[in-house]
Amino acid sequence: MDVAFRLVDAFTETPFQGNRLCVVPETPVGFSTELMKMLALETNFSETTFVTESRPDGYRMRIFTPDAELPFAGHPTIGTAYTLASEGRTSTETIQTTALGNIPVEVDLERGFAWMTQKQPVFGPEFDDRGVVAEAAGLESDDLHPELPMQVITTGLAPLLVPIRDEETLRRAERYEPACRRATAASGGECLYLFAVRGDGDVMARMFDASLGVGEDPATGSAAGPLGVYLASRGLAGMPGEAVIAQGEMVGRPSFLHLDVRPKGESWNVRVGGGVRIVGEGVFRV
């Protein structure tokens, strides 16, 4: 059985930067979960997506890391949406369905850009164990921001948001997996999303994974939305409004995640977008 795939870079306007993604735009009927896991492990990208159903108003897909299936993830969302729209398989405004539910997506083919609207945020409690988080990041407790709290917020997945004193300190951070596991277990977060505000509309972030086999992620759209809510709700980085998160430089894959977070009733409308480039294609022989 031949299964076509595309190689995609998301959250970048430059090929071979951003976060890598493998997209299977038309998954054969009856293709098993075990085969999807095998192909995700074969690519060894942070995520591989399988489009399993197309319908007039959208499509359904599944997302796999080399270790697990995810209910939702950011760069697979914009990368898959752009790939399908660029090939005429879907419209430029459509609904993507995953295990999490429906996610509206918009594609700008001329610009090579895509946006997703994430779920309305749910705020978790603030987390005060600075010691374990500092250890997880290879830092000292005093390197964390002295005034801003750590907090879990979810718009689909739930990162522990970790404000760092400044950009220089953030660049010094080094992931220590055992402490990452302890920090996520204690806080209820699914990863650590460290960030430093550099100015209005300008934020640097790094994602340290605890359990998904990713290590340090070049671009994390599922964490960018919660960070946007954190910033907007506190009036940081010139938000509410628009901002850009720079991520991935420390792992050689510079990425830029665009935020547009604005009040919506008593909650927030959370949009995350970025550039997408299709850089290759091929066939799995299964």
Segments the model singles out, each with a brief description of its role:
Residues 1-72, 78-286:
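Active-site proximal loop and beta-alpha junction motif in alpha/beta enzyme cores
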